[in-house]
Amino acid sequence: MEVLNLKNIGVRGVNSALHDVPEDRKENFEILNPQGQHSIACGINAPLNVKVKGHVGFYCGGMNKHAKIIIYGHAGVGVGENMMSGYIHVKGDTSESAGATAHGGLLVIEGNTSSRCGISMK
């Protein structure tokens, strides 16, 4: 399992590492110290397993294709926004618009969610 410390490499570094994996490879990643940063693990287009250890900000896992993302904390606005396939599991609560424009995949929220959850799913 590759460990990505967001505090050290930033959101761009984390997302670049996730995007650099070829579409046909399945790898495991653990993201540490998300500290409520926005746009973590967005645009993944490979069957990755991603564990985010902590709370995330807006749009975590947005535009997901194929990846399994587990968030061990709460998520801000728009988690799983425009998800095409894959799986996102939030172990805490989410803000509004969770999975609002998802076209596929599965979004699981163990806690509570706010308004507009799945409002425009296809």
Regions found by a protein language model. Name each.
Residues 1-122:
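Long, distal/terminal scaffolding or interaction modules
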